[in-house]
Amino acid sequence: MAKDLTRGLLFKPIYKLYELVLWNQIRNGPLPDHVGIIPDGNRRWARDNNLSLNDAYFYGYKKLKEVLIWLLELGIKNITVFVLSTENCDKRKQNELSIITTYIKRGIQDLLEDPIVDKYEVKVSAIGKLDKLPKDLIDYLNRVVEKTSNYDKRKLTLAICYGGRQEILDAVVRLLDDYRNGKIVKSEINEETFRKYFYDSELQDIDLVIRTSGEVRISNFLLWHVAYSELFFCEAYWPEFRKIDLWRAIRSFQKRKRNFGA
């Protein structure tokens, strides 16, 4: 225990120095306008540390609060978080889903009460098959969406019970309904008009996707919006994600030449 404490005391100033070095590297560079977060690895982190399932999502919830502050302070205007996929919504055991939704609700309560939302004028929205969520959670979501509806400086989008394929399918169905009802003609159908049928028609394309836990995939996350995203995969599990990991992701983004498919 004493050895671990000594090691921590020794590494802390080195960590802070490295954080400062990274900050000096990125502070004057271009920032992504829209950052997408896939916070993966809560359960594996808990298992490796002999912690409970509840601990896994508690520390994941705490980390998300911390990272959102980092992103807002950095100046990121649009943030989308992959909170819960449709696959997990449908396949996870009920006791685990209960824990997950408990901390989602706690996070929504924080958004209702935290002055940082008002300070940065963060507009909050939620996308996905929200009808699958518990009614009390839906009520909290509606409250925070309504409370922040007039803010326009920043935007936080929560993807809950969300799947990229399902969103595109739902958009196609709505488009076909409008076509059958004469509300749109074939010549008017293009990328711009198609976007209007998504869950959030105002959601911008994502510039940078950050995924934790070492998994190198996007897992059905906003498939349309990540078509030209830069991807950054971090080895750390989500509860271990540090500010230097975020700075590294930003530095990586700044070093890339974006061709948008050209």
From Swiss-Prot:
Enzyme class, first EC level, given as a word:
transferase
Q: Return the similarity comment.
A: Belongs to the UPP synthase family.
**Annotated Pfam families:** Prenyltransf (PF01255)
Under Enzyme Commission nomenclature, its number is 2.5.1.89
Q: Where on the tree of life does the source sit, at the highest rank?
A: Archaea
Q: Which residues bind Mg(2+)?
A: 40, 230
Q: How is the cofactor bound?
A: Binds 2 magnesium ions per subunit.
Q: Provide this UniProt record's keywords sorted from A to Z.
A: Magnesium, Metal-binding, Transferase
Instruction: State its cofactor.
Output: Mg(2+)
In Gene Ontology terms, what is one molecular function of this protein?
A: magnesium ion binding
Q: What does this protein do?
A: Catalyzes the sequential condensation of isopentenyl diphosphate (IPP) with geranylgeranyl diphosphate (GGPP) to yield (2Z,6Z,10Z,14Z,18Z,22Z,26Z,30E,34E,38E)-undecaprenyl diphosphate (tritrans,heptacis-UPP). It is probably the precursor of glycosyl carrier lipids.
Q: Which residues cross the membrane?
A: none
Q: Which SUPFAM superfamilies does this chain map to?
A: Undecaprenyl diphosphate synthase (SSF64005)
The cross-references to NCBIfam families, in alphabetical order and at most eight, read: uppS
| Protein's UniProt keywords contain Transferase | yes
User: Which species?
Assistant: Saccharolobus solfataricus (strain ATCC 35092 / DSM 1617 / JCM 11322 / P2) (Sulfolobus solfataricus)
Q: Which gene encodes it?
A: uppS
Could you identify this protein by its name? Tritrans,polycis-undecaprenyl-diphosphate synthase (geranylgeranyl-diphosphate specific)
Active site: residue positions: 40, 88 (proton acceptor)
